[in-house]
């Protein structure tokens, strides 16, 4: 199972049921369980990471705030943003946490390069940036040697809710998205490229695609 990856497309979902399903998957997986990547668009929500501080919630208005157990601080999820959750057995892949963070950042950088968008990681703030503007947020959690949570890549969305917070705890952090930089507006195209780059970076030999997932709507 080391080189098998299951990719699940969940469509548009509320945050909490997916969060709960990630926990259940991680708690019940064993050494034979294949790694999975879940691709999803969330309904509008602010999520506070474990390092989140209330003062970074400026004016959340009618958008709910959910406490999450991922790393990092506050961010926004909404339609038009590609969220990818990485349910990977790090021990089996012989990856450290820092290795995984670097792999995910390179995954996004390579994906954007396919659309002639030059981007880079920053040593002081996880994520991926284009000329100082943030295009991808990153937050992970490790349990029993396995990762969950993942990345949020802005593709073709309403960015204005980011003005209601200090994204990832940075006051005035400017956000940008793929469609503004000449890339596709279609999330499905970006998903395909992202999965292709992930398979290349982590050496999966067998990839199975699914639109089904055990995610119960609340």
Swiss-Prot record:
For this protein, the record's InterPro entries field holds:
aa-tRNA-synth_II/BPL/LPL (IPR045864), BPL_LPL_catalytic (IPR004143), Octanoyltransferase (IPR000544), Octanoyltransferase_CS (IPR020605)
Pathway(s) where this gene product acts: Protein modification; protein lipoylation via endogenous pathway; protein N(6)-(lipoyl)lysine from octanoyl-[acyl-carrier-protein]: step 1/2
Enzyme Commission number: 2.3.1.181
Main location, first listed in the record: cytoplasm
Its subcellular locations are: Cytoplasm
Q: Which chain positions carry the site (Lowers pKa of active site Cys)?
A: 134
Q: Which residues form the active site?
A: 168
Question: Which residues does the record give as substrate binding sites?
Answer: 70-77, 137-139, 150-152
Gene Ontology molecular function:
lipoyl(octanoyl) transferase activity
Domain of life, source organism? Bacteria
Catalytic class of the enzyme? transferase
Q: Name one GO cellular component term.
A: cytoplasm
Q: Which reaction does it catalyse?
A: octanoyl-[ACP] + L-lysyl-[protein] = N(6)-octanoyl-L-lysyl-[protein] + holo-[ACP] + H(+)
Instruction: Extract the Gene3D superfamilies matched here.
Output: Bira Bifunctional Protein, Domain 2
Q: Where are the transmembrane segments?
A: none
GO terms under biological process: protein modification process
Reply yes or no: does the keyword Secreted apply: no
> What keywords appear on the UniProt entry?
Acyltransferase, Cytoplasm, Transferase
What this protein is reported to do is described as:
Catalyzes the transfer of endogenously produced octanoic acid from octanoyl-acyl-carrier-protein onto the lipoyl domains of lipoate-dependent enzymes. Lipoyl-ACP can also act as a substrate although octanoyl-ACP is likely to be the physiological substrate.
Share any extra remarks: In the reaction, the free carboxyl group of octanoic acid is attached via an amide linkage to the epsilon-amino group of a specific lysine residue of lipoyl domains of lipoate-dependent enzymes.
Q: Which protein family is it in?
A: Belongs to the LipB family.
Q: What is this protein called?
A: Octanoyltransferase
Q: Which organism is it from?
A: Vibrio vulnificus (strain CMCP6)
Which gene holds the coding sequence for this protein? lipB
């Amino acid at each position: 199972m080391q080189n098998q990856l299951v990719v699940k497309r969940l469509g548009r979902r509320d945050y909490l049921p997916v969060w709960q399903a990630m926990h259940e998957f991680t708690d019940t997986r064993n050494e034979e369980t294949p790694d999975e990547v879940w691709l999803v668009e969330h309904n509008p929500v602010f999520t506070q990471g474990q390092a989140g501080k209330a003062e970074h919630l400026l004016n959340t208005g009618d958008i709910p705030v959910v406490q999450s157990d991922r790393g990092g601080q506050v961010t926004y999820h909404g339609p038009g943003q590609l969220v990818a959750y990485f349910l990977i057995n790090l021990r089996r892949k012989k990856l450290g946490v820092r290795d995984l963070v670097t792999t995910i950042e390179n995954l996004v950088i390579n994906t954007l390069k396919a659309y002639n968008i030059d981007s880079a990681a920053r040593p002081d703030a996880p994520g991926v940036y284009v000329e100082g503007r943030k295009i991808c947020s990153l937050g992970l959690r490790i349990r029993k040697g396995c990762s969950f949570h993942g990345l949020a890549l802005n593709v073709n969305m309403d960015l204005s809710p980011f003005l209601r917070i200090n994204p990832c705890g940075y006051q005035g952090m400017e956000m940008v998205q793929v469609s503004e930089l000449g890339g596709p507006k279609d999330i499905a195209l970006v998903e395909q490229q992202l999965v292709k780059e992930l398979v290349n970076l982590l050496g999966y030999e067998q990839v199975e695609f699914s639109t089904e997932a055990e995610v119960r709507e609340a």
